[in-house]
Amino acid sequence: MMGGGQQQQLQQLSEELQAIDEEIDELREEVDDLQSEQTSIDEAMDAIQTLESGATVQVPLGGDAYVRAEIQDADEIIVGLGADFAAEQSADNAVESLSTKQDALDNRIESLRDDIDELETESSQLEQQAQQMQQQMQQQQMQQMQDQQPEDNE
């Protein structure tokens, strides 16, 4: 029979592994979201650099609805600053602001990837520990079965 303490430790390891795996998944989702934001910023920077005064563009209204609008001044760009604040900037300054956001996103993504690597290492170590514990429990169980078999003296 397996030791209750070992079985409990194995259960605890399993729960820790599950929690780590869930955290890794959450961090990966966050990385994906940040990468999507980076793509959006790249597209905005490209658009700013190719905008021309007098050009007609489609402006999203939400819910997949758009309106056509004419660019009056391609050098006046409104850039979100965060927390629902925005500022009007020249095209060059807007690209610079967006580039700064890109750098911050790069740093955050790198930090998240480091966290993921650490958690994956921890997960691997816990998996090895759980496997060793299972092997040990199986060996003990086999030994107990052998000890319980009657010996033939004939």
Swiss-Prot record:
GO function terms (MF aspect): unfolded protein binding
Compartments in which it is found: Cytoplasm
Keyword Cytoplasm: yes
InterPro entries: PFD_alpha_archaea, Prefoldin, Prefoldin_subunit_alpha
GO CC aspect terms: cytoplasm; prefoldin complex
Bias (Low complexity) ranges: 128-148
GO biological process entries: protein folding
Stretches the record annotates as Disordered: 92-154
Coiled-coil region list: none
Ranges of biased composition (kind: Polar residues): 92-102
Keywords for the protein's UniProt record, in alphabetical order: Chaperone, Cytoplasm
Origin superkingdom: Archaea
CDD domains in the cross-refs: Prefoldin_alpha
Family membership noted in the UniProt record: Belongs to the prefoldin subunit alpha family.
Subunit structure: Heterohexamer of two alpha and four beta subunits.
The name this protein goes by in its record: Prefoldin subunit alpha
Organism the protein comes from: Haloquadratum walsbyi (strain DSM 16790 / HBSQ001)
Name of the encoding gene: pfdA
